[in-house]
């Protein structure tokens, strides 16, 4: 009877202690679960090969990923090089086209300028004979009466206006007398000996030449010196009276010998 009571009291005391420390029971339970799991993993022979297989698969995936990244990097670099080459090609083509267009523009401008100059030269060449006639009239005419002088002054005024217009257009007369003959500027019409001028020096201007903005508008017609002429050799002429006297003396001597 007493033994039963003591045993029941012992059980009650254990139950009370367990109820008074619920935290201890709750903390100790996870550790106990982890230890149990470790024991179960260590005891299970299939777990270790599975872990090894997972690590191998991970390594294979990493290596394949690195290979793919290397392949993508090489493709990107090749594509970049190709784009750089295409850029250089297009840039060179653009520079060539730009240079060709610039040359075309300059050539067109030069051709237009040349055409303008040709038209101007053609027009002025038709006007120059009128200027020549005015100059001849000024040199040859010598008006004496008052009316003639008034008429002379009037057309000389027209001549001055015409010369001024030509000057404004860039026309300038040549100065050729006493200059060395230049076939690019002069046209030799006559050649004659001259004791005063050296050879190939312009003696006289027969028709005035003109420049147009540095270009030859009309060549000058000139007379060119040939230099000093050949010297005349003055041979001594024997005295006719002396020869006659010698002839008479020889005749007299011959007659004396005969006698």
Swiss-Prot record:
GO terms for molecular function: adenyl-nucleotide exchange factor activity; protein homodimerization activity; protein-folding chaperone binding; unfolded protein binding. One of its GO terms (cellular component) is cytoplasm. Signal peptide: none annotated. InterPro entries: GrpE, GrpE_coiled_coil, GrpE_head. GO terms for biological process: protein folding. Its main location: cytoplasm. Residues 56-73, 240-253 have a biased composition (Polar residues). Belongs to the GrpE family. Participates actively in the response to hyperosmotic and heat shock by preventing the aggregation of stress-denatured proteins, in association with DnaK and GrpE. It is the nucleotide exchange factor for DnaK and may function as a thermosensor. Unfolded proteins bind initially to DnaJ; upon interaction with the DnaJ-bound protein, DnaK hydrolyzes its bound ATP, resulting in the formation of a stable complex. GrpE releases ADP from DnaK; ATP binding to DnaK triggers the release of the substrate protein, thus completing the reaction cycle. HAMAP family: GrpE. This is Protein GrpE. The lineage of its organism: Bacteria, Bacillati, Cyanobacteriota, Cyanophyceae, Synechococcales.
